[in-house]
Swiss-Prot record:
The lineage of its organism: Bacteria, Pseudomonadati, Pseudomonadota, Gammaproteobacteria, Aeromonadales. Substrate binds at residues 79-80, 122, 160, 164, 167, 195. This is UDP-2,3-diacylglucosamine hydrolase. One of its GO terms (cellular component) is cytoplasm. It comes from Aeromonas hydrophila subsp. hydrophila (strain ATCC 7966 / DSM 30187 / BCRC 13018 / CCUG 14551 / JCM 1027 / KCTC 2358 / NCIMB 9240 / NCTC 8049). It is a peripheral membrane protein. Keywords: Cell inner membrane, Cell membrane, Hydrolase, Lipid A biosynthesis, Lipid biosynthesis, Lipid metabolism, Manganese, Membrane, Metal-binding. The gene is lpxH.
Amino acid sequence: MSTLFISDIHLCAQRPDMTAALVRFLAHDAPGADALYVLGDLFEFWIGDDDPNPLHGEVADAFAALSQQGVPLYFIHGNRDFLLGQAFAKRAGMTLLGDPCVIELYGERVVLSHGDLLCTLDEGYQKFRRITQLKWLRWLFLRLPLARRQAIAHKMRGQSQMENAHKSQTIMDVTPAAVDQMLRQHDCRMMIHGHTHRPAIHDFQLDGAPARRIVLGDWFEQGSVLICRPGEQRLEQHALI
């Protein structure tokens, strides 16, 4: 009996080792789980479900094979793949969830999020995030020619890398006040999120009672998986080879 959580795999054609590691995880480690949650940034970027990139089909089929074995699959959008839609989710056998969302995990209410909502000190990014949530803008972008979307995504990734190189680590991390607010708002004592690439389990006090925040790791150097069982949460690392 276990529920699995992963995030920030950042799959792309340039890193076939990460794709192979994920496919291996889905085929050999995830079967038999009570559920698998992917908390965003499964892909390095996503410009629409109509992108014919063969990587997308390979990954969707690997998830679908797990779904067909009876493992429920859930996905929360990240800041890199916020345009991932129902067509891909249907092929992969996934259910799309909102951010944040609350689940019942072995009798405990847990709030899930990709995590970028919690980085409130990064005001520039939060402004950009609000813009990307505009439905009319998404509708317009997805109707651009595929080549145009690819060019825009490439330019935006370059700008993001340049900006992040000059930001402090504090600005790009979550703020305690935002964590506390989200927990209170959803009446939870536990939170699971990704985005910051700083895997850890943080225990703290919230309104005089114990609370826990679990941060998932990325898959750049090794796979990072959170394994939850009744009364237990454990972060594990998996080799990419």
